[in-house]
Amino acid sequence: YQGSAAMWAKWWGADWIRAGVSGYSAGQGGNPMTEPVAGLPDFMTESTTTVGISAILETKWKREGRYDQEVAELKSYLSSNGYDMTVTNCVSYWLSTWVRDYGVDGFRCDTAKHVDKQSWKRLNEMCTDALKT
């Protein structure tokens, strides 16, 4: 995988994360919002670009026989709440699903300064709504 863009393309995709590996951005050095922490892959939560389902999730969900269901639920939720399919909105939806389905009442984040405030706001909104259901 080290240098193979074709192999890395089967992972999240360059619209989803920055990772500094073949086919992915390394981010902007010196900016905590756009630079991977300690070389670890980083979701591009600041991005307003509409994304598709990542290759890794497509493969996983198809193998499990639940691709259509997962995509339909995600798109339905985002659409009915007026959200675009962005990295932040997808990740926030998945985290809020844990709140809705399992009663999770908190998340730990060791690198909060690396996530933009709008993404924290969106996560808060979605999780607060999930608590009401």
Residue ranges and their predicted role:
Residues 1-97, 101-102, 122-133:
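Substrate-binding/active-site clefts of carbohydrate-active enzymes
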Residues 112-119:
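Acidic-and-aromatic substrate-binding clefts and catalytic sites of carbohydrate-active enzymes
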